[in-house]
């Protein structure tokens, strides 16, 4: 039999498991929102703890909170940040759209734990109050968006950007290493004029470099914090210096460039910063999907596909076809990119649907945002380690396909004109001839002229990979 204790909120008393630190409002949420399995992300829980820690420190500094209470709240928050009490945050994403219940979940846990630190008990006789002390100078309406931005910015800076930079570096190295390998290009899935493998990969590098700039450009808006706006953005019940000082405290303890939002009404009423930042992440997903698809097409085979590059063979690919090996890293990346694009639709809908002074789609928005960051960061790390770093050219196959291409005839345009060059290509294709044989048979040029004018290595231009 589960031992319980009585907890009380503005709606009255309710029984709570005696071994849990949470209180009445958390218990009500557990009972009223038994929806699916998605819980508040751990990084969001930690961001809430950071927010409460900073608020307690600033409230103490401003003379609004007793030093012993502030110290106990800070210690309790540090325990949460250290990974303790992880099972004290059981609430579903699918709850109130303001995140109020998760804010109160944190308030109740920290209040009960702080009370114990001060020698008191958890429950209605506790020494620290979840609203009056832990939530002092705050509202769920400014706390939750603040925690969203803290979690989002830290995830981008600490996880996604390093992995994006690492993958970019790997592909840049490959681009330089393969700069002298001339291969056939392809447009519309048809043969086109030559380029080097290094040039082809340099396009991927530039895509990722642009994506990094777009993501970094979104960070200053994400760094703006709503804390201090309280209920509707007016700052009701806060000290005049509170908003600025609490943002500075969060910047200090996270070593991140957080600032107080210049307009708290925007900060509470919208999720625009995360909508825009996620748009940059969706752009990254689009680029990664293109790169992964190019890699698996170029590596297709081993005997009946394009086969211009080889990628690492990591695991068996079929339960029925012996010896088959598949481009599994590419497949994982393309799947997660699809999920990111779906997340973007949900975030756009949530961001567009806030009414008046408060957006109430916040738990869904941050859940999808953090999932996107995790998927992209983990996906790039895996793709880099198990695929991109092991890409190698199949020089024999590249040369074979290059020599068989009819599009080398493009080099003759400036010598004999487009129409005659097209006639050479069509005759070669129809009769199964080489371009040279077709050109000589038509009498448009000699063997020597063909060899002098149709030189794939001179058709790739002067574009240096990486520029």
Swiss-Prot record:
Q: Which branch of life, at top level?
A: Bacteria
Per the record, GO CC terms? Answer: cytoplasm
What Pfam families does the record tag this protein with? FumaraseC_C, Lyase_1
Coiled coil ranges (UniProt) are none
**Where does this protein hold substrate?**
98-100, 126, 129-132, 139-141, 187, 319, 324-326
Subcellular location, record wording? Cytoplasm
Renumbered to this chain, the signal peptide range is none
UniProt record, GO biological process: fumarate metabolic process; malate metabolic process; tricarboxylic acid cycle
Summarize subunit and interaction data from the UniProt record for this chain. Answer: Homotetramer.
Give the PANTHER family listed for this entry.
ASPARTATEAMMONIA/ARGININOSUCCINATE/ADENYLOSUCCINATE LYASE (PTHR11444), FUMARATE HYDRATASE, MITOCHONDRIAL (PTHR11444:SF1)
By sequence similarity, the record places it as follows: Belongs to the class-II fumarase/aspartase family. Fumarase subfamily.
- What is this protein identified as? Fumarate hydratase class II
Source organism: Salmonella typhimurium (strain LT2 / SGSC1412 / ATCC 700720)
Q: What is the lineage of its organism?
A: Bacteria, Pseudomonadati, Pseudomonadota, Gammaproteobacteria, Enterobacterales
From the UniProt record, report the name of the gene that encodes this protein. Answer: fumC
